[in-house]
Amino acid sequence: MNKLLVILILALGFCSNTAAQIDPLLLKASATDSVKRSLNMDAVYNRPFTAIGKLPVSLGGYAEANWQHIGTNGVSDGHQFQFRRMTLFVASTISKRIKFLSEIEFEPAEKEIAIEFAAVDIEFHPLLNLRSGMIMNPIGAFNQNHDGPKWEFTDRPISATQLLPATWSNAGFGLYGKTYKNQWMFGYEAYLSSGFDNSIIENTENKTFLPAAKKNAERFEELQSGEPLFTGKIAVRHNKIGEIGFSYMGGVYNKWKQDGITIDDKRRLNVFAIDFNTTLPVLKTFLTTEWAWVQVNVPETYTEQFGSKQHGGFIDLVQPVLQRNIFDWKNATLNAALRLEYVDWNIGTFKSTGTNIGDNLWSIMPAISFRPTPLTVLRLNYRYLQQKDILNNPPAKTGGFSFGISTYF
């Protein structure tokens, strides 16, 4: 079925001899300009689409590929070449106030084609829209605003993919809306969806690990706990200050009842996140950051390696250092960037010794990126990372370079 869907999409791209035209509103060269007109919640639509003749759909997408040479404690696998992903967007305006958008991702390493987003939006009022289908839960900012060409780094933030389960999609529905006045903009989202299961504490990582739930494809048809996952977010933006968002995701994750008989206590997980982005005056430095706190009700019979409290986040700084016409590229930009990251999967102390539990890491990643156009980025990164095991033994030290390209098409 997935293969047929991809073939259909590719066929649409070639079946028209009419010249395609990209919506100029989506080709703003300045990231700052696009941010002023939108919130992170608009990321699913704030992409370049190509209209093909009189076909009722618009297409788009992006691809990512990179080289890396990374080693841990002096041991390296040498040069590695990776085609990370190719993603296709399909959008359609069904009628006035009704539209559809989907995001289909192919990851060769995972040997799978996955639908990450496929939802129908019905607008009743700018502050009241109904969304139904396969949604991206708005926890933090990265989960919704994750397109590779928007970032100066070859790797996604560790806290977004190894603490939170980005990209995290579920079957569900809910409401969203936004409004603005003068320099201010306000937006909200509230969804009920399927969600997590026992795999977050029963996995090969042998720790509390939310991303393990992504492997359960049954969540798109069946909710193990029988109780919906709630995800909500509010965001406020001022054009001269930036955007701040507060989000929450929580619900019962375990199977606590079977055939009407209670077989376990209800066990909840709660995730709180805050995100912020702004462009600093004078130097035009772009800053974006996200931090999340995770609380999981772990059974008392589990060992202490399964943490009930976790937290982590990242901060990105991007400084334009050169902007000029190069070859046929107008306003090509050279950036210097830096990412700082921290994740702790097990906050607390051992009951027997009172010493701190480990299982954490920190990372620093300087980068240089070149954007010939706003839609394409070439990026050279160096990562240095230290990770401690649960016993706080001397950390494993990882370092190395990566170079990659990511572009919309």
What are these regions (language model features)?
Residues 188, 192-196, 206-215:
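A short, charged helix-loop
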Residues 1-22:
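Bacterial Sec-dependent N-terminal signal peptides
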Residues 208-257:
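Loop-centered beta-sheet repeat module
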Residues 22-26, 30-33, 74-75, 118-123, ...:
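Outer-membrane beta-barrel pore domains
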Residues 18-64, 409:
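N-terminal periplasmic/intermembrane-space "pro-region" immediately following the signal or transit peptide
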Residues 53, 80, 112, 165, ...:
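A generic structural micro-feature
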Residues 145, 159-165, 201-205, 217-223, ...:
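Extracellular/periplasm-exposed beta-strand and loop segments of Gram-negative cell-envelope proteins
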Residues 46-70, 75-198, 226-231, 235-243, ...:
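Outer membrane beta-barrel
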